[in-house]
Amino acid sequence: MFTHKYNNIISVENLLSTWERFLKGKRGKKDVMIFQSKFSDNILALHKELVGRSYVHGAYSAFNVSDPKPRNIHKAEVRDRLLHHLIYKELYWYFDTRFIHDSYSCRKDKGTHKALDRFREFAGKVSKNNTRTCYVLKCDIRKFFSSIDHETLHIILKRHIEDPEMHWLIGQVVSSFHTTRVGVGLPLGNLTSQLLVNIYMHEFDMFVKQELRVKYYLRYADDFAVLSDDRKYLEEILIKMEEFLKTKLKLSLHEDKVYIKTYATGVDFLGWVHFPYHRQIRTTTKHKVVRNLKGYPKPETVSSYRGLLEHGDTYDLRRRTGLQPL
């Protein structure tokens, strides 16, 4: 049980230490500089609202991004984002220690590359070092962030968090956003959303591991895969997984992105197509890399793509774009 007390969490000292974390990489941002121009007044005003429980989350500004795929991002005001960081900082370690090992999204010492390596490890074990057929059930949850049910999330949180005032605070953040349906959806862009969706999906992870007793399962956000040498077994657990997602979490699978394939014929997972002896970057990603590296790309763009391309069979693409290993 998370036992930290609300009054300690919202202390001025804690707000100040959280602000220092929040500032990293943001000092030159206009909205941050405006907040900092009256820093003491803003911090004390926020603290007063939190103490009196009169705090109301502000509005969001929305914009679209298209890399790696089209997404609608919602950005909160600085004071609200500071509070997101505070909540995240307090809750992260409590929940992270309870998550399953093979949940890889938005966690320290996890990430895409660890998930890719784990997928390869699982495939090697199931296929007995590529000497028998390995089947992969690959699934994608439909409209993941925009389908998170607020009431269900609160029920899950109440099983872990004792302090009712902490529930109130988290509730202010959760209820600050909804899709076309009131009480549904978390915004892409909130730091808290990254943690809350992992808490939400931990219910599914535990169902898969403890109830279904699936051995070779891994998940990255809304993408997950199960590996087995028995296709019929995968077909059977898919039905049970869909039912749990629908009835317990009010989520559904993306019908166009659910399939069972053999490892030998190539499995598309986390941007790469996986084969027994190599993995190839997805064709759409390849075109995007070439397009984004034309002209004079930013150094951070070059560095990001160089890191990406080191994790698969990309010699021709690296030669074409000039991204040879350092």
Task: Kindly give the residue locations of the regions a language model identified.
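Non-catalytic, polymerase-adjacent accessory regions of viral genome-replication enzymes
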Residues: 1-44
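Active-site-proximal segment of RNA-dependent polymerases
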Residues: 2-5, 90-146
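Reverse-transcriptase-like RNA-dependent polymerase core
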Residues: 11-15, 46-69, 82, 89, ...
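Short, conserved non-catalytic motifs in the polymerase core
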Residues: 25-33, 58-84, 98-111, 176-198
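Beta-rich nucleic-acid/ligand-interaction surfaces
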Residues: 106-115, 225-226, 260-264
